Amino acid sequence: MANLFKNILDSLKLTDDEDLDDYDDYVSELEEKERRKTERQEQRQAVKQEKRTFPSQRPAFSEEAPTSSSSKLSAASGSSDFADLRKERSQRMEKTNVSKVVPIRNPQKGLEVCIMKPTSFEDSQDICDMLLSGRAAVINLEGFDVDLAQRVMDFISGAVYSLNGKLHQISSYIFIISPDSVDISGDYLDLIRQNGFEVPTLNKDF
C-alpha cells in the first residue's frame, strides 16, 4: 500500500516535472519570440533612423539648390548687365551719329566785302591793301574827277593783274575787285575779255 502510494506520488511527481518542463519550454519559446520580436523592432528602428538621417547625409543635394538659385541670380544679373551694355552701346552710337552729322554748307567766317568811294589818288593804295588781305572791294567812282578816277583804276588794275585777281564792272563808274580765292557771279559787264586783261576806260563825258 505504501509502495503503491509512493508510486502514485512518484507518478505525480513525474507528472509535475513534465509539466514544469513543458512550462519551461513554453517560457523559453516566449522568451525566444520576445527576443526575435525585439530584434526585429530594433532592426526596424535602425532602418527608420537610417531613413531619417539619409537626407542630412546628402549635402550635395542641399548645396545644389542654392547653387541653382545662385546660378539663376547670376544669370539674371548677367542679363541685366547685358541690357545695360546694349543700352550704353546704343547711346554711344546715337552720340556718334549725331557727331557725324555735318551741315552741307558751313558758314564762311572772315569773308568781308568793303565798299570804297575814293576821294583822292592815295585811296587806291588802301583798296589794293584790301585785295592783298584777301577781301573783296566795291569801288564807287561816281562824282569823282574823271582823269583822277582813271589814274585810280589804272593803279588798281595793275594790282589786280599782278595778284591774279578779278575785276568786274557793275555800272559805268562802279567796279568790284576780288582776290583769286573769291568768285563773283552776276548780271554785269565783264571787263576781262576772253583774249586777256583790259584796263577799264572811264567815260570822259561824265
UniProtKB/Swiss-Prot annotation:
Give the superkingdom in one word. Bacteria
Record keywords: Cell cycle, Cell division, Cytoplasm, Septation
Q: What is its main location?
A: cytoplasm
Q: Which InterPro entries does this chain map to?
A: Cell_div_SepF (IPR023052), Cell_div_SepF/SepF-rel (IPR007561), SepF-like_sf (IPR038594)
State the Gene Ontology BP annotations. Answer: division septum assembly; FtsZ-dependent cytokinesis
What are the start and end residues of every segment in region (Disordered)? Answer: 31-81
Annotated coiled-coil positions are none
User: What GO terms fall under cellular component here?
Assistant: cytoplasm
**Any single Pfam family the record assigns to this protein:** SepF
Where found, per UniProt? Answer: Cytoplasm
Kindly indicate where the leader peptide sits in this chain. Answer: none
What's its job? Cell division protein that is part of the divisome complex and is recruited early to the Z-ring. Probably stimulates Z-ring formation, perhaps through the cross-linking of FtsZ protofilaments. Its function overlaps with FtsA.
- Self-association or partners: how does it assemble? Homodimer. Interacts with FtsZ.
Q: Please give the name of this protein.
A: Cell division protein SepF
